[in-house]
Amino acid sequence: MDKLVPVIPAKEKSFPAIPSSARHAILVPSVRFDDNSRSIIGSLIGIANEETIVLIADNSENIEKKRFLEQIRAINPNIFAVHHEKNIGGQGNFDYLFDWSEGVEFTALMADDDWISPDYHVSAFRYLEKMPHLTGAAVGNSIIMHGSPRERTVDGSQPQMVGETPIERMRKWSGVTSRITMYNASRRSALKNAAAYIRRTPIPAITLLEDLWETNRLALGAFVTKPGKGFLVHNPTPTSSWQDIYQRLHGDSALPFSYIYFSALSTAIQLGIFHTGTLSPLKTKNDKTVCANHLFDHVFKKQFLATVGGQEKVARSQFSKHPRVLEGFLKYCMPPFPDQITFDQNILEWYISLVDALETKPQNGEVPLSEKFRQFSSDLLPTFQLETL
């Protein structure tokens, strides 16, 4: 078996062959090359085999990292790796790995800046094999490292999200801990809709991948947590500043830095689009309506309003020349707030008008970002008659 790590040319999407015996794939989108990332990748040597393979897509543009991955493959050839000639971004790297693992029944993510004991995923894969009604499982313990030195360790294990119906499962979901549970083992079939949506949306959003991934699973089946010896340690602090988040999500887009304060609004809106529209994993109109409204309201209030709610003075100053945007802000973002804020055509059109007001318009005849998002939304929501800006 060839131990070399192939270089994937820019704008090309070729995949090294993986064995037909593979049933589990641990996906590692990687960009770092430090002591921690080397330790994480090296820890996988002991568990990769013909049934449980490891797929690493390297975005580092570091030739030393490529050589390191070849040394890893020389020890265990069931760890497969590619080296992107040019960094294709975090979302592009996720898309690459998800496509590469097509045909493998079970999958899980592993970051190169957190720590997951190798048996954490293997135990969950084995549990899912025995329980065909489940879409995801965590077998072990999740720990979040943040805060002051005396309060750094927090239990991040998410409650079991089980129930007879999708809404029963989604009511137990939290848009915060999905950043941890997205790493847990899943049936690949329970992630396809979310992956298709992420690939098509023209506007990324804060925790959008995590939230779509998680709620796609919950639409189809239960997520359980079980005791085990394995563990996941999540360290969110290195990318916690607004500037870091902006650069990661929108640094090369037409959106200004001020848009970052509306990124959670985008997440809420796109959860509504996903679960209402043609890519929704939900089967009935009632399930789509109830679940989309619940998820939209949850993220809108817990994440978006917690940041900008009630800031009338700032909104009047920023949107003084955009009366439609200001009107929507005063309607949706000022108290008193209703018990549930509903996802509908009006609030979607307000969001699109917000993007239109904030974006830098292209000068070369290209379609503005707001219009791209309007077209994208119209394609997925054929019952909505969205206005052209």
Predicted regions and their residues:
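Glycine-rich, basic loop-to-helix element that forms the pyrophosphate-binding segment
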Residues: H84-E102
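A short, conserved alpha-helix in the catalytic core of glycosyltransferases
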Residues: A190-A194, P202-P227
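A conserved acidic beta->alpha catalytic loop
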Residues: A57-L69
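Conserved donor NDP-sugar-binding/catalytic core segment of glycosyltransferases
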Residues: H121-V154
